[in-house]
Amino acid sequence: YYLFMRYNCLTSVGLSLKRDVFEKLYPLPNSMCNYQDMKMHIDILNIGEIKILETQLIRYRRTRDKTNISAHNSITTTRENLETEMLLDTYLKFDNIFLLEQIFHKEVNKTNIKPYQETLPFFLGIMALESDNIYKKYWGYHKIMEFYKNDANAKILYEKYNFTFKDYLQLAKKCD
């Protein structure tokens, strides 16, 4: 939940992977700089199990001059905002619908939009519109736009959610 709605809550220092999981994750996209770790965590969530040790074994080393790639400065924030859409596209590969329903149980109850494999882009778009992050909201709206423009998909949305063009018009309010 936190990875999708907020920010990366996991670190990769000392990350251990089984070879078969590693081979599914790599290579990471060259064009993604700040969110490579987060993308990897999302992919691991989709294809395997995450085990987090309770004991802190490793400490991050931070430079005082804020020159490292993850330093909190304006260029890092800009880069992260620009990478958000590519990062969220990672969720479109999810095939564990039950897991998505567990992750977003509060939003599913609030919106009455349940996940189905055939409506995954729409579902994730609706979930992103529930985020506080405007870049995630824009991504969500764009995914819904792309999905809804197809007449067959519009029919599926009506059948599963009673979603109409009137509902579609209201979604822009979530980005305002």
What are these model-derived regions, one by one?
Residues N46, Q56-D176:
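C-terminal subregions of glycosyltransferases and related glycan-biosynthesis enzymes
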Residues C33-I42, R79:
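Acidic donor-binding loop at a coil-to-helix junction in glycosyltransferase catalytic cores
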Residues V21-E23, H41, I58, T67:
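A generic structural signal for short hydrophobic patches within well-formed alpha-helices
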